[in-house]
Amino acid sequence: MQYSFTEKKRIRKSFAKRPIVHQVPFLLATQLESFSTFLQADVPGTQRKPEGLQAAFTSVFPIVSHNGFARLEFVSYALSSPAFNIKECQQRGLTYCSALRAKVRLVILDKESPNKPVVKEVKEQEVYMGEIPLMTPTGSFVINGTERVIVSQLHRSPGVFFEHDKGKTHSSGKLLFSARIIPYRGSWLDFEFDPKDILYFRVDRRRKMPVTILLKAIGLTPEQILANFFVFDNFTLMDEGAQLEFVPERLRGEVARFDITDRDGKVIVQKDKRINAKHIRDLEAAKTKFISVPEDYLLGRVLAKNVVDGDTGEVIASANDEVTESVLEKLREAGIKEIQTLYTNDLDQGPYISSTLRVDETTDKTAARIAIYRMMRPGEPPTEEAVEALFNRLFYSEEAYDLSKVGRMKFNRRVGRDEITGPMTLQDDDILATIKILVELRNGKGEVDDIDHLGNRRVRCVGELAENQFRAGLVRVERAVKERLGQAESENLMPHDLINSKPISSAIREFFGSSQLSQFMDQTNPLSEITHKRRVSALGPGGLTRERAGFEVRDVHPTHYGRVCPIETPEGPNIGLINSLALYAHLNEYGFLETPYRKVVDSKVTDQIDYLSAIEEGRYMIAQANAAIDENGQLVDELVSSREAGETMMVTPDRIQYMDVAPSQIVSVAASLIPFLEHDDANRALMGSNMQRQAVPCLRPEKPVVGTGIERTCAVDSGTTVQAFRGGVVDYVDAGRIVIRVNDDEAVAGEVGVDIYNLIKYTRSNQNTNINQRPIVKMGDKVSRGDVLADGASTDLGELALGQNMLIAFMPWNGYNFEDSILISEKVVADDRYTSIHIEELNVVARDTKLGPEEITRDISNLAEVQLGRLDESGIVYIGAEVEAGDVLVGKVTPKGETQLTPEEKLLRAIFGEKASDVKDTSLRVPSGMSGTVIDVQVFTREGIQRDKRAQQIIDDELKRYRLDLNDQLRIVEGDAFQRLARMLVGKVANGGPKKLAKGTKIDQAYLEDLDHYHWFDIRLADDEAAAQLEAIKNSIEEKRHQFDLAFEEKRKKLTQGDELPPGVLKMVKVYLAVKRRLQPGDKMAGRHGNKGVVSKIVPIEDMPYMADGRPADVVLNPLGVPSRMNVGQVLEVHLGWAAKGLGWRIGEMLQRQAKIEEMRSFLTKIYNDSGRKEDLESFTDDEILELAKNLREGVPFATPVFDGATEEEMGKMLDLAFPDDIAEQLGMNPSKNQVRLYDGRTGEMFERRVTLGYMHYLKLHHLVDDKMHARSTGPYSLVTQQPLGGKAQFGGQRFGEMEVWALEAYGASYVLQEMLTVKSDDVNGRTKVYENLVKGDHVIDAGMPESFNVLVKEIRSLGIDIDLDRN
């Protein structure tokens, strides 16, 4: 087994019983693949598939002018490289995007040409089509400097759907069936039955009309309509009664209305008897062809065809007419013998279309189309052209109607056609087929569709959503181009004069900036990033709304298995509408979710893996991943638990066709990080997976001792860690950069064989948490491709580490852990275990005002020297300064208008000159409740404005850093070149050279070492070929130097040009503060099992309960939090964590007494290879074993994968290994070694009972009391009510609400109540009076009229009631 460089350092012991058959796919693949298909940037123009941008262009172009003599054709498009890289865009508040240019061709035809069109002229040109935001390598977008994510949308797939109203519409509870044809874009077509069984259709939820109008409009006559929906009874008329053609199955189950006889007149079925199978057999035996029926059997029948008098050509009776006595009379008079009527019955052949035809008043195709026109455009006169145009545009025009590839495939599958391709518009037979199926449903044949089945819902990803927006923009452009194309020839216009890119840019900008699906990326920790990008939402444009979504849509559906996580979804109004993709889920070409399965042939599991969509899955019998298999892959059990079409059952192995790839296949990333998930109640697991996303990265991340084995995948795929692009040797490493000399076999010829990784240092995330990368390699380390070189936020040695491992005791402690409160030891705070750094960004802009420009300066009047001491000469705070609330960060003055001066001020101005008073201080100060250290300052200056010293210094530092990178690359390139050169020169014969090298001398190593490297090129070689090589190497080095100089120049140009700032802004300064947040009472914490709580008290270490060896617990939790919540996983995690730490302590003890490496090896083998997945420790060298042991002394990390975790027996073994009997006895453990004797820290007495003790991975959540705590002195008031505003953001007051007033009333505290409702709230005069009284030392309240009372009076007056105060 291959271990990567970092895995070797700390192997996670896995308890998995199943081998890994299928690696977890790259977690961000959905986003990245979708967007790259949209752009197709790396595909040459001619080879692009009709997807994404290419599809949008080809669907709109060519654009033809109204007169048809000019057309604009699309050739190809190209994307330029972005002007700024991702980091620069984030700093400058720009969008990371690329300019889109399309090559278009203007073709003008000759108007004078008499016969076929002749091309007069062709102009081809590249036209700018706006900017397209680019996706970062981690699947997000940088829009206006902030990272955003486009969430995928789960919407109803295009196609045809059949459903019923579940009996809710009509009081009788009758099922009303309906069908709906949903296109990808265009008008929806609905068909529905009403309670009277008449079939209607409606277009786009407009007024309903009988469906036969639509059938006539597509060109069917009433006869054809009936022929399509009914079978006919054939009658031959006699003088009295008639002969009915005998069709056996139409009679079965009917009640005979007369005696049925055979040819000889023998009665086979008596009148009023039900006809059964024996009767039918008798009739068939008697070779009955016709049955004689009496006259009244014909009455009430419905004619299937028009009946025409053969002699006169007159229509005697029309199709769909009822047969009456008069009609029969006419028929006999005309000598008509054969008639056909509709066969209907009450059971499975209803007369629905026939009754609908009766309701329909239109006569022919034209009348029907006019009726449809009147419904769509009420009030407009129906001219013939308008009627035709509207009808064709509804379903038959490619511009207005598009079923899409998916829609056509779904439609054809649903109506039972074999081919899955076809035209993208609706065809006449599509409409007919839909109505036929709907009528059959009403007749009781077939099933309605399940809307929530994942085969009926598809996912729209970034690429598709962006393409729709881009197409919408292009369509707007098309309209404008059509108008102008007419003038193209006369005014000699070029293509760029015709196309205005504004509509495209605005459509794209609106989508990425303010669409409901474009969300501010959740960047609290790496897990929250990954989850956000894997999210699937049913909300958004064209989706559901929270209010209208019912219970069914939100519920877990059997088809979610392996596609959408049944656990992870938000609590609250969005529950079930926002989901997360399952670990192995992936999208097929149609946008349906698929999940992988292993093929099973003859009850033997193969290695073939097939991805099945929800519809395909329904056809197979699928076993679960934990089915027992022998070493040959044969299914062992007699009965295997399996699923078919959403039902679970036990079947014999020979019926199994597929098997799950992994037990964790059904859950999402967040849920698969919860160890022992199988022992937790689903509601708590939901909370657990949601709360992991809120974990704040700690200062020193610590890997979870009990994990699930997904941690590494998660950390690496999120992009927080730094991975090696190519293998090589670490040449240089410091806190900020890693330089790797690439292996020769991986280096590309002619390119620099150097990879430089600049690490992210103390950068602010979207949620103000700190993103910081730390190298985990040393100089000289050999790394291979994909190895982790540096840890990021919340990662430890390349594994996700959201919290800290805490020693947890389950016991009550003086009521301090009542109701989920958490008691924490002071040691945890002292060791900075949960300390986190938060980075706040503060901005100030200097604008150009009417009265003159604002100025950023140090020269501010009335500012204390202490405040000025922190500012440099440009008026900007120094980096490293520690600041408190109210301190000045950037000095800024704004000119203020001339005011009327008081005599005192006039005197001051006379003495001190002009400057003092015509500006006001508008400096950037630290907001209330915030303090921290300044860690970075950025200054942006508009083009043409003089840079201050600070801005210049920042640019110089940046250039210095860049030069350092280039020098490193050059150093390594030159080093390699001179090594190659030395190998080539040694032993060659020289014709002469520096230091008096004689002709004919052989060059040796000593001579070369004595010379300066650059003088090697002066050696003249005898061998011409070698001399040419020497020249080539010299040229390549000079070429590289030249390239590096050019790159440096370009960087300098980019930095020294002015910054793009919003209009009217001259300068912008950003100051970054690092705020250190220690754990304190009021902070929210949680485990991974939904066990959340609030820190209630931080207890001195000497008061905490401790073990017999003096080790105190870190956290004390209430045992009552476990049973009722049913998240027992936390208890198992504590046991296994206890074993993990115990093993670590034993390894630490071995290292301390310097045990022999063999002893260490055998102990590690016992841990790793006695049960669960085996590890290949044989391949490790002694040094590697030693390094592994050093990393394990803090606890052996375990992996207990979801649904395939450690058993009780395995945990017992590990506990026995970790705590041999002597240690167990010393700690007073119980026989199963998971409970310990504890002593009270305050009295030293032993607790009566043993306590469950162990290690749990505990998280600090992003709900910090510091961010919520808030107090107000004087602040803003609401305009209307004059009451203080509410909330921390508005610097608001505390609300004294209705119930609080009741409390004071109940106490009878009348004066407190009075001041609360008047002077402390909205009595405007009273408020100012209080201040006056206090200044005068007179402590009296003059309470007046509260403003809200005046508002109430005004409201009542606005109702027309005159209310006035009697002021006597």
UniProtKB/Swiss-Prot annotation:
GO MF annotations in UniProt: DNA binding; DNA-directed RNA polymerase activity; ribonucleoside binding
Lineage: superkingdom: Bacteria
Catalytic activity line of the entry: RNA(n) + a ribonucleoside 5'-triphosphate = RNA(n+1) + diphosphate
EC number(s) from the headed UniProt entry: 2.7.7.6
Keyword Nucleus: no
Pfam families: RNA_pol_Rpb2_1, RNA_pol_Rpb2_2, RNA_pol_Rpb2_3, RNA_pol_Rpb2_45, RNA_pol_Rpb2_6, RNA_pol_Rpb2_7
Record-stated family: Belongs to the RNA polymerase beta chain family.
PANTHER family from the UniProt entry: DNA-DIRECTED RNA POLYMERASE I SUBUNIT 2 (PTHR20856)
Name of this chain's protein: DNA-directed RNA polymerase subunit beta
Organism per entry: Burkholderia ambifaria (strain ATCC BAA-244 / DSM 16087 / CCUG 44356 / LMG 19182 / AMMD)
Gene field: rpoB
